[in-house]
Amino acid sequence: MIPANSTIRSLFLEGPAGRLESLLNAGSEKATHAAVVCHPHPLFGGTLHNKVVFHAMKALNSFGFPVLRFNFRGTGLSQGEHDHGIGEVEDVRTALDWLKSEFHLPLIFARFSFGAAVGLRAACADPQVRATIALGVPIAPVAADTEEPRVYSFEFLESCDKAKLFVSGARDQFGPRAKLEALVASIPDPKKLVVIEGADHFFEGRLREMREAIEAWVKEAVGSQPSVLGRL
């Protein structure tokens, strides 16, 4: 069993738009992977402290993996301005590059909502990323009367051959089940879709089930076992 490490390190990464506020949950000396988790849309309150992001971090950290969370540009103490999902892709690359140089381990890339939309492309193109986890994929168009109307494209997934986990709520208002099932069916293996009954986009009241889905899949895809302490 891998002992848990409860150390949390606060740091700033040097990104193309300035410093990115970050938190690193330390891993075990026997860690086999390192991971990053991206937060949801900053214009709608998304930060690295989001509940879904936190529980995804805890799931990955329970395996002894060091896990990085960061605020996208213009969010929290991160410098720069929100760039409508364009410059944020470079923020993801900054986080991935930092993890590579810091740990020299294969990477797992996890993200929620907006983080999934902007980060998947960077993760699929990075040879050191071995597995990806998408939570609450915003596959439905964002309403035109919102502050940032947008339709996200996931066509690049058709050439992404990394291990892929999708976790969605059956009542996700931004990721209709039929559309998500069609997307997953169109992309190459290895892949897995877990739909949590009764859950909405934010997994309200279903965070434990979401976390358990991540842990079960990591055991399958990576072959690691979570620490009992890491589940606290």
For each predicted feature, which ranges?
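Acidic catalytic loop of the alpha/beta-hydrolase fold
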Residues: 141, 170-175, 201-202
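Short, surface-exposed "cap/lid" segments of acyl-processing enzymes
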Residues: 28-69
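Short beta-strand/loop motif that positions the catalytic acidic residue
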Residues: 159-161, 166-168, 172
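Gly/Ala-rich beta-loop-alpha elbow adjacent to hydrolase catalytic centers
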Residues: 111-119
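N-terminal cap/lid segment of alpha/beta-hydrolase-fold proteins
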Residues: 1-30
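Catalytic histidine-centered segment of alpha/beta-hydrolase-like enzymes
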Residues: 199-211
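Catalytic histidine neighborhood in serine/cysteine hydrolases
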Residues: 186-202
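Alpha/beta-hydrolase active-site loop
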Residues: 52, 82-102, 121
